[in-house]
Amino acid sequence: MNAELTKKYKYWQWRTLIVLMVAYILYYFLRKNFSAALPAMEAELGITKLQLGIFLTLNGIIYGFSRFINGFIADRCSRRLLLAGGLVLSSVINFTIAFSTKLDGVFNLLDVEGKATMGLVYLIGSLWVINGYIHGMGFPPCASLMAHWIKPSELATKQSIWNSSHSIGAGIVIALCGWLLTKFGM
């Protein structure tokens, strides 16, 4: 490769890596916010630890299967579309969960004390399990795009840099959700 082409390649390589990091920070933000909201959901809606545990367990199982399934999908379709589509779908589900108590007038999801009925519990749980599948749409495109753009001799180093997105996303969500719950409540 000539110097001009090498310079362009490095530029796009780093740009791709940064975009993938931002995308995975957002995936982590959308995945870990539920954990940060658990105490508030338990206190304000009366959802039990057992119910929350079932949601989280099923979410984790579905997430594991989803990463496997979406690995095959990422090899056969647009990785960028899969990555972005998962972020959009997960955002929609997160907003639906966040505003699910506002659907009370339509679906009678809260009892007279303002606690969750089983309908609301099933709605939140089902949405979170579906979100588990959608979260599995994040890693396969990232891994595939990194392998496509980064030389094998540099891949481990660049993946180590990309892996910091997990910690950054988790840190941001805990800090932000903690502040939001303190400031605005559920």
Stretches found by the model and what they are:
Residues 40, 71-72, 179:
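Membrane-interface helix termini in secondary transporters
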